[in-house]
Amino acid sequence: MLKTYLAHAIEATDGASTYDENVKYLLADRQVLAYILIYAITEFRDMTMDQAMDCIGDEIEIGARAADPGLSNLGSIRGTNTEDSVPGEGTNIYDVRFNAYLKKDGIKILVDVEAQKSTDSGKLGYHLENRIVFYLSRMISAQKLTEFFHSDYDNLKRVRGIWICMDGDDEGFIEEIGLDGKRILGDDYGIRREDTDYV
């Protein structure tokens, strides 16, 4: 019988590696990622499991790309470095990063899946929502020189961050944090949601 990646990942979680590493490898399974895409990202909501799996790019990075400035966009357009760091601040590493493609629409979405043990700001020392905004912002700003060059900002790709929080209540929920424009003064000058739908 042919074993799936998920079956191998579950077997590999024998206590030799840390809880954090185990969760990352389980989350990186294509079937698990397809399920996450369907239930957490609007663009994939009407897809079957097979359709969603077909949208997942070939490279799934596990704990390999940093979120901090200066490191997240290393490499070429197909670069896979997943680290970002600022001197004296340590390095923030994305748990699972991959690209998802809506092929018929020609859309590429950069996806980050994070396993978060605690959401308690007292334990973390910060509010988790602020870290989420930081990671999403870095996924946008790190696209320069990897997804586009010079001032070709129309080639920015959408980014999505899915944070799976382990300390939630039994019912669970999905909350969306995004960038929403709103007119404060004057006439509408034609900003369309689809032109600014990056987060």
State where each predicted segment sits.
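Elongated, amphipathic alpha-helical interaction scaffolds
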Residues: 1-199
